[in-house]
Amino acid sequence: LENGISFTEFTYQILQAIDFYHLNKDDGVQMQIGGSDQWGNITAGIDLIHKLEGADRPAFGLTIPLMLKADGTKFGKSAGGAVWLDPEKTSPYEFYQFWINQDDRDVVKYLKYFTFLSREEIEDLAEKTEKEPWKRAAQKKLAEEVTKFVHGEAGLKEAQMITDALFSGDIKNLSVTQIEQGLKNAPSAEVANETKNIVDFLVDTKIEPSKRQAREDVKNGAIYVNGDREQSLDFEVDPASAFDGKYVIIRKGKRKYTLVK
């Protein structure tokens, strides 16, 4: 305890025990259910109930094994990187990406937990993952099933459409809302609402570290503006070409996007 502990951490078990006591006494709640890491907190509540209300007072605890990822960390919001069912907090695209990026070591387990696929289907996907992991068949099926279950067929199709567009670079048919979903975590920049030469634009938005590098990447065909490859050093980035008048999308290389406002 060289650095001490917070008041919240110090009182957590006490407050949870008191909470269980009041729920038991005032509302007749007899059982508390939690993850296996909550065993001590739950039994503290049971002990408090028995001391204050008598040893014969019905009070029980039930714990469920924690779902751990292959690296041993918890699968949950307290461990960071969790997803929400609410599309306002986690968009269908983000939700889909979360599942499609699961580790090969976890994906079969998640298919069993979170989908209604038959044992035969899951075993077939497990075999495909073992033989051809680069195809990510199990991850794609997991993402498809869970996204459809939570966000419906429309949410799944939108997530797949955004995924395919960003992967291929063909973003012209995406709406502004879909672009914002897909590039929510991409680098962003702001520039003045004026026409600029492509080289100056790339440097001003810090997409390129120097004009020399910008010229080189443009000439080599590494720069895409709103989905189109631009190789002319005379090209002008015009605000009028922005998506819905809001964004110019720059792609450098295969999939390095920047959202420019």
Regions found by a protein language model. Name each.
Residues I49, E53-K261:
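Conserved nucleotide- and phosphate/pyrophosphate-binding catalytic cores
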Residues L1-T63:
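Divalent-metal (Mg2+/Mn2+/Ca2+)-assisted nucleotide/phosphate chemistry catalytic cores
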